[in-house]
C-alpha cells in the first residue's frame, strides 16, 4: 500500500501539474512518477496519476479516495466548480494550499528509508508512460468528448441558461438520466466502458457506488412508476433534446398513449433545440414525426415521436433509446412492437408511467417487481413499514417517517384525500401518491393463489364420516389469542381448533373458529373467554367423539395473569383432558400455562400460506362456531382474512405478515396460523395444569 510519506511528493507533483497551462487534464501532464515499484512485473500496476505501484493497490479504496480529493478536477466541468444539481461532491477548491502535517524529524527519517523513485528501471518507466498515454487517449476520445458535452449541457440546462429558470433533479429524474447516459456509454464505447463509467461517477455523486452496481444502468429495460404531476415528461423532453444536440449517431424513439401527448412532446423538443442550439442544424419532418439534428462531419441524431394507436409506426425502425410514456395505458396491441426492441443488441426501453389500480390491464408494469433483474423503480409517499397505519387512519396523507418528502409543488392534506376518495375509493393512494400496495388486492400479486382459496372454500371434508374420522388424530389443537375489550371495531379474541391426519401431520383440518368480543368490561374477562373456548371444544367433541385430548396454547403477550387464569378455567371445565403450552419464568424455575408469541409468527404465517397453496389445509363441513355462525359462514369469514394476507419487508431482509383490513381485524387468522403451527411442527411440549 502507499506510505504516508509519499503524500508530500504526490502533492508536489499535483501542484506543478495543476499550475501548468496545458491542454492535458490535471496531473496527466506530469512526466515523472511519484512512486516506482520495481518488483516483479506481474505484481506491479502502472497508475497514471501516481506511478508504478504494487498491484494490490488496485483494490485499495484509500488510493481511490486520495486521487479523488487531491487529483485533477473532473474533466467534464468547464470550471473548477462542482455540480450540486447532480448530487456531486463538493470540489476541493485549493489543493495547492493543502499543508502536510509531518514533523521534520519524521520526514527526514522516512526520506532516508524511502529513497526517491528509481527512474533507471526503463521497463517500469515505460509502463507508467503508457498508462499516462492511455489515460490521455481516453480524454481525447470523440465519444468521451461528446459525453462530456452532454453533462455540461445538462448542467447548463438545470442552472437556467436554457429555460431562464433553475431546476433541480428529483431522485427518480436523476435515475432516468443515469439509465439513459450510462447505457449510451456502454454501446458507444465498448472497450473503455468501465473506465468511462469510473470517470463520470463524480459528476453525479456516485463515488461510493461500486462498478458492479453501475452496471445496473446497462439493463435492456427499466421501469419507473411515478405519481401524477411529478415531471415525468419534462425530464424525458430534456434528455432527448440534450442527447440530440450533443451526441452523434443516436436514434431515439418516443411512444405516447395519446396523440396530443406525442404532439406536445414533439413541439417541445423542437422548441428546445431551436432556441438553445443552432436552429440551422435542426430538421423537422412532420409527416413522419421525426426531428434530425445535424452534426458537422458526423452522423446525425434523430428522434421519432409516435403513438400507440399506430402500432406499426415504429416497426422497421432502429432505436438506441425508446421512451414509452404512460406505459401502463399503452394499447396492448402495440406492446409486441415495443417489446421487439428488447432483441436489438444496442437498444434500451425505458417505461415511465403513473400508477393506476383501477384494473389489471392498466397496472401490468407492477408485475415486474418479481423480475430477476431489478427493473422496477417505484416512487411512493408511504413506506412498507407504515403502510398498515396509512390504511387505518383516514387523516394520514404521507409516511410518518422522515425518509420521504413531498415536493413543494404537490398539495396533500386530509381534505384532499377525503374528497378524492369520494370520487373513487383508493384514488388518492394510487393516482396521487404512487402507492402500489393496493394492486395486491387485485390478482396482480397474491400471497395466496385464487385457485387455492377456491379449493379451501368448496372442497370441505366430511369429518362426520366414520372412515374419515378413523384417519384423524385423537388430539385437538386449540390456540387462544385473547383480547380484553368489548369494542367490536377493535381486535377481539381469536380462537381456532384444528386436528391433523394421523398418518400425515402436515395435513390439517379446521374444526372450529371463534371471534369473541366481551359483553362488558368487568372483572370476569378471563372467565368469559375461557367459557367461549370450553363451549367450542364441547361442540367439537360432540360431533367428533374420536377425540381423546385437547392441546391448548393461550397467548400471554397482552396479559400474562389473565392468560394463566384462562388456562386454569379451561383445565377445570373442559370435557376432555387438557394439556397446555407452558412458559418458564426467567427469575425462577416455575412454568406458567401460557404461550409468549415471539419471532415464530412469521414462520407460522409462511407455513400456513404454503399449506393453503398446496391444499394441505382443509375445513370440515361442520366447522363449529358459536360467535360467527349466526351472521356468516365461519370458513368464508376466515377466507376473507386469508385474502388480505400481505407481506411487509423488514430492514433485516425478512418479512412479517398481516391480514388486517380497515373494517376487519385478523384475530381469527392469527389464531388459525398458530394452531396450524402447533399441530404441524410437533415440537412444543404440553403439560397439564392440575
Swiss-Prot record:
A motif (Walker B motif) lies at residues 321-326. Its main location: host cell. The keyword DNA-binding applies. One of its GO terms (biological process) is chromosome organization. Its EC number is 3.1.-.-. Belongs to the herpesviridae TRM3 protein family. Component of the molecular motor that translocates viral genomic DNA in empty capsid during DNA packaging. Forms a tripartite terminase complex together with TRM1 and TRM2 in the host cytoplasm. Once the complex reaches the host nucleus, it interacts with the capsid portal vertex. This portal forms a ring in which genomic DNA is translocated into the capsid. TRM3 carries an RNase H-like nuclease activity that plays an important role for the cleavage of concatemeric viral DNA into unit length genomes. This is Tripartite terminase subunit 3. It comes from Epstein-Barr virus (strain B95-8) (HHV-4). The lineage of its organism: Viruses, Duplodnaviria, Heunggongvirae, Peploviricota, Herviviricetes.
Amino acid at each position: 500500500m502507499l506510505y504516508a510519506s509519499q503524500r508530500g511528493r504526490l502533492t508536489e507533483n499535483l501542484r506543478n501539474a495543476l499550475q501548468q497551462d496545458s491542454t492535458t487534464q490535471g496531473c496527466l501532464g506530469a512526466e515523472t512518477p511519484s512512486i516506482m515499484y520495481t518488483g516483479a512485473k506481474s505484481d506491479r500496476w502502472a497508475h497514471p496519476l501516481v506511478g508504478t505501484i504494487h498491484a494490490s493497490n488496485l483494490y485499495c479504496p484509500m488510493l481511490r479516495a486520495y486521487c479523488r480529493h487531491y487529483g485533477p478536477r473532473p474533466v467534464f466541468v468547464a470550471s473548477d466548480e462542482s455540480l450540486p444539481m447532480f448530487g456531486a461532491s463538493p470540489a476541493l477548491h485549493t489543493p495547492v494550499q493543502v499543508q502536510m502535517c509531518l514533523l521534520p524529524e519524521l520526514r527526514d527519517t522516512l526520506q532516508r528509508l524511502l529513497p526517491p523513485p528509481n527512474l533507471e528501471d526503463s521497463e517500469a518507466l515505460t509502463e507508467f508512460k503508457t498508462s499516462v498515454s492511455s489515460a490521455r487517449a481516453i480524454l481525447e476520445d470523440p465519444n468521451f468528448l461528446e459525453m462530456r458535452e452532454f453533462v455540461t449541457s445538462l448542467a447548463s440546462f438545470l442552472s437556467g441558461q436554457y429555460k431562464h429558470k433553475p431546476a433541480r433533479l428529483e431522485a427518480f429524474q436523476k435515475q432516468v438520466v443515469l439509465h439513459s447516459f450510462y447505457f449510451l456509454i456502454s454501446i458507444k464505447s465498448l472497450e473503455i466502458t468501465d473506465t468511462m463509467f469510473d470517470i463520470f461517477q463524480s459528476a453525479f455523486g456516485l463515488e461510493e457506488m461500486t462498478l458492479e452496481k453501475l452496471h445496473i444502468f446497462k439493463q435492456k429495460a427499466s421501469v419507473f412508476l411515478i405519481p401524477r404531476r411529478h415531471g415525468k415528461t419534462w425530464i424525458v423532453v430534456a434528455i432527448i433534446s440534450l442527447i440530440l444536440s450533443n451526441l452523434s449517431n443516436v436514434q431515439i424513439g418516443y411512444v405516447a398513449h395519446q396523440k396530443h401527448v406525442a404532439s406536445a412532446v414533439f413541439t417541445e423538443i423542437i422548441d428546445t433545440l431551436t432556441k438553445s442550439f443552432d436552429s440551422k442544424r435542426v430538421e423537422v419532418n412532420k409527416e413522419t414525426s421525426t426531428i434530425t439534428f445535424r452534426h458537422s462531419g458526423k452522423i446525425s441524431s434523430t428522434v421519432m415521436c409516435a403513438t400507440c394507436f399506430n402500432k406499426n409506426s415504429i416497426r422497421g425502425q432502429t432505436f438506441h433509446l425508446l421512451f414509452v410514456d404512460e406505459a401502463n395505458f399503452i394499447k396492448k396491441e402495440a406492446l409486441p412492437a415495443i417489446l421487439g426492441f428488447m432483441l436489438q443488441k444496442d437498444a434500451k426501453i425505458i417505461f415511465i408511467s403513473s400508477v393506476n389500480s383501477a384494473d389489471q390491464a392498466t397496472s401490468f408494469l407492477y408485475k415486474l417487481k418479481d423480475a430477476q433483474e431489478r427493473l422496477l423503480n417505484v416512487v411512493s409517499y408511504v413506506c412498507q413499514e407504515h403502510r398498515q397505519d396509512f390504511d387505518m387512519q383516514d387523516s394520514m396523507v404521507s409516511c410518518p417517517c422522515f425518509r420521504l418528502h413531498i415536493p413543494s409543488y404537490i398539495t396533500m392534506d386530509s381534505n384532499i384525500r377525503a374528497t378524492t376518495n369520494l370520487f373513487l375509493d383508493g384514488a388518492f393512494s394510487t393516482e396521487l401518491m404512487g402507492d402500489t400496495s393496493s394492486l395486491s388486492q387485485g390478482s396482480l400479486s397474491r400471497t395466496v393463489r385464487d385457485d387455492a382459496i377456491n379449493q379451501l372454500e368448496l372442497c370441505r371434508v366430511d369429518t362426520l364420516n366414520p372412515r374419515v374420522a378413523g384417519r384423524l388424530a385423537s388430539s385437538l389443537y386449540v390456540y387462544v389469542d385473547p383480547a380484553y375489550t368489548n369494542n367490536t371495531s377493535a381486535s377481539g379474541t381469536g380462537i381456532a381448533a384444528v386436528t391433523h391426519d394421523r398418518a400425515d401431520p402436515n395435513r390439517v383440518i379446521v374444526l372450529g373458529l371463534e371471534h369473541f368480543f366481551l359483553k362488558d368490561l368487568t372483572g370476569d374477562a378471563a372467565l368469559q373467554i375461557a367459557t367461549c373456548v370450553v363451549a367450542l371444544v364441547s361442540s367439537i367433541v360432540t360431533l367428533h367423539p374420536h377425540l381423546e385430548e385437547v392441546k391448548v396454547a393461550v397467548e400471554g403477550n397482552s396479559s400474562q395473569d389473565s392468560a394463566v387464569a384462562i388456562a386454569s378455567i379451561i383445565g377445570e371445565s373442559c370435557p376432555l383432558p387438557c394439556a397446555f403450552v407452558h412458559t418458564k419464568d426467567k427469575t425462577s424455575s416455575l412454568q406458567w400455562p401460557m404461550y409468549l408469541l415471539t419471532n415464530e409468527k412469521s414462520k407460522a404465517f409462511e407455513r400456513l400460506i404454503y399449506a393453503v397453496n398446496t391444499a394441505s389445509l382443509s375445513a370440515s363441513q361442520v366447522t363449529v362456531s358459536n360467535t360467527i355462525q349466526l351472521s356468516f359462514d365461519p370458513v368464508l369469514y376466515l377466507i376473507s382474512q386469508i385474502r388480505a394476507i400481505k407481506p411487509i419487508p423488514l430492514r433485516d431482509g425478512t418479512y412479517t405478515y398481516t391480514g388486517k383490513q380497515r373494517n376487519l381485524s385478523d384475530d381469527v387468522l392469527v389464531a388459525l396460523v398458530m394452531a396450524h403451527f402447533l399441530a404441524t411442527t410437533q415440537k412444543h411440549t404440553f403439560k397439564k395444569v392440575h
